[in-house]
UniProtKB/Swiss-Prot annotation:
Pfam families per record: Bac_rhodopsin
Residue ranges that the UniProt entry lists as topological domain Extracellular: 1-2, 54-67, 116-119, 179-186
A molecular function (GO) term: photoreceptor activity
Protein name: Sensory rhodopsin-2
Organismal lineage: Archaea, Methanobacteriati, Methanobacteriota, Stenosarchaea group, Halobacteria
Residues bearing PTM N6-(retinylidene)lysine: K202
Similarity remark: Belongs to the archaeal/bacterial/fungal opsin family.
């Protein structure tokens, strides 16, 4: 099957995933800001896959083709995933900011690794791995400590966080095996694996988030019941 076919499969899958938060937003207008983040995750990914299907943003690095749209997608959508997790945990603005910055740093290092050859790409890969370790600390340690006592919110957060951590940890392994790394995976197989990982890490994330709408309703209700002048967060926000 041609590579472009897999890109179109990814585009259709992401577009289908975008319907879920849009429908939830229509049914529950109070969830709007949560649903807009979710719609951005799959909606922007659908646009990226469409451009790859059309052959746009493809560039040659050495003897391999790099699809810049894929990395631009990750540069935008992975922070949205982190943002959604932070919206559930509510750690404070400064903590959320450094988590988002860490995520962008990791993806930027990945872009640099994809666009370079030789020793440089491995240096950028190592830098990205170090950044990812910091991001994991935030996802596994910092955010859970900030969670409130509501069991529904905690359950939703843990489910989404675990999906994210497990799948995101597979991406660098797949990259190592790809033509950009040691070349065990050929281009078509690498593309298939990434489409599959993207689908689960984005569409499944969005689907579980929408299914957990009750947890979001509880957060919205808590906000509505909170006094106009809120207590300072642990971050001082």
């Amino acid at each position: 099957m041609a590579l472009t076919t897999w890109f179109w499969v990814g585009a259709v899958g992401m577009l289908a995933g975008t319907v879920l938060p849009i429908r939830d937003c229509i049914r529950h207008p109070s969830h709007r800001r949560y649903d807009l983040v979710l719609a951005g995750i799959t909606g922007l990914a659908a646009i990226a896959y469409t451009t790859m299907g059309l052959g746009i943003t493809a560039t040659t690095v050495g003897d391999r083709t790099v699809y810049l749209a894929r990395y631009i997608d990750w540069l935008v959508t992975t922070p949205l995933i982190v943002l959604y997790l932070a919206m559930l945990a509510r750690p404070g603005h400064r903590t959320s900011a450094w988590l988002l910055a860490a995520d962008v740093f990791v993806i930027a290092a990945g872009i640099a690794a994809a666009l370079t050859t030789g020793v440089q790409r491995w240096l950028f890969f190592a830098v990205g791995a170090a950044g990812y370790a910091a991001l994991l600390y935030g996802l596994l340690g910092t955010l859970p400590r900030a969670l409130g006592d509501d069991p529904r919110v905690r359950s939703l957060f843990v489910t989404l966080r675990n999906i994210t951590v497990v799948l995101w940890t597979l991406y660098p392994v797949v990259w190592l095996l790809s033509p950009a790394g040691i070349g065990i995976l050929q281009t078509e197989m690498y593309t298939i694996v990434v489409v599959y990982l993207d689908f689960i890490s984005k569409v499944a994330f969005v689907a579980f988030a929408v299914l957990g709408a009750d947890a979001v309703s509880r957060l919205v209700a808590a906000d509505a019941a909170a006094p106009a002048t809120a207590e300072p967060t642990p971050d001082g926000d």
